[in-house]
Design a protein with these regions (language model features):
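Generic alpha-helical secondary structure signal
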Residues: 7-10, 19-25, 81, 115, ...
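Signature of the catalytic double-stranded beta-helix
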Residues: 1-57
Length: 162
């Protein structure tokens, strides 16, 4: 499968690639209800690159570090209003998306993804990679009514997720 690109240029874009469930069976099998998983993707941020502040089509993700280091940050923001809808580029095809890219933001939180994390992806967020190596994470999305940060968080806290 090809890598898709959210954005116009390699270094300030998020590169994504779907993963076959069989390839990550050992991870999916740790979930008590793997049937609630919608898809699993690799996300790549280029060396010395960034992913601009954006929100996803989905509301929640569990991101697992695959190749990361302490010069790569996940950043959350508050929107100051202005946003647009970026295209997804797959090869020479453009796909319209409901995701938003924010033009005016204030940073509210920054952390290094060195362990799995549950993210509220409906909030503006991005990535800064100040290292010489690409950053790669495995990102898990959830189906239908499970595409909810509070629902996944509650399942985790009540030991019903993993």
């Amino acid at each position: 499968r090809d890598w898709a690109r959210y954005g116009n240029q390699d270094h300030n874009s998020l590169h994504t690639k779907y993963v076959d469930f069989k390839e990550v069976e050992h991870i999916i099998n740790q979930f008590k209800r793997p049937e609630i998983i919608d898809n699993v993707k690799f996300f790549k941020t280029m060396a010395n690159g960034m992913v601009d502040p954006h929100s996803d089509n989905r509301s929640v993700a569990i991101n697992i570090p695959i190749r990361t280091n302490d010069k790569q940050s996940t950043i959350f923001y508050e929107s100051l209003g202005d946003y647009d809808n970026p295209n997804i580029n797959v090869g020479d095809k453009k796909i319209i998306t409901k995701a938003k890219r924010y033009n005016k933001v204030n940073e509210t939180q920054r952390f290094i993804l060195n362990q799995p994390a549950c993210l509220n992806t409906s909030l503006p967020h991005g990535v800064e990679n100040l290292s010489e190596s690409d950053r790669v994470v495995l990102s898990i999305s959830f189906k239908d009514e499970y595409d909810s940060f509070s629902r996944i968080n509650n399942l985790y806290r009540s030991k019903q997720l993993i």
